[in-house]
Amino acid sequence: MERLRKYIESLAEKHRQLGHREHSPHFAYLNDEKDMLLPAQMCYPFVLLGHNGYQVTEDGERRRWNVLLSVQTHVTDTGDDREKNMAVAQCGKILNDILVRSRSLDERTKNRWLVGLDLSGAMSTPIENEADALYGWVIEFGITLPWCKVTDSDAWQEPDSRFPWEP
């Protein structure tokens, strides 16, 4: 998942509306405590990446990670529907830009592991957090990374023919 984190962070650095930098944070990885920022520390629009577990692929060999990717921005007036709609539209475009870029043939040639990115059945939902004045989009999708194997032949010592409870 570290490679995916670095990849999405690099897209946040390259995107014209984001320009993520250390001194101007527009990205955080939810599964890393050092990336936890307070809303006052974030620069908007903001990209959040995280994962909430995995499923084992049909062949029983690999993990298919459930990934959450979100783009959010802050609005100054939560009562202004026009401002909220513009914020949601802006975040939707940025999220779409990231997904389209990661699915492009050019990116898949440079980063062969992106072949495991599966957007079929991906669910996107608008975010409306009125309490924090944050609006945007979140999408949940899957990715199967070739090096995330479930089986590991070196994990076990030589098999013992006896059960532990037998003398």
Residue ranges of model-derived segments:
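Oligomerization/assembly interface segments of phage tail-like spikes and tubes
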Residues: 61-77, 132-147
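Generic alpha-helical propensity signal that fires on short helical segments
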Residues: 65, 87-89, 155-161
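Acidic-leaning, charged glycine-interspersed low-complexity segments
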Residues: 1, 16, 20, 40-47, ...
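Extracellular/virion structural assembly segments
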Residues: 2-9, 60-64, 72-100
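Short, surface-exposed linear patches
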Residues: 50, 69-71, 89-94, 161-166
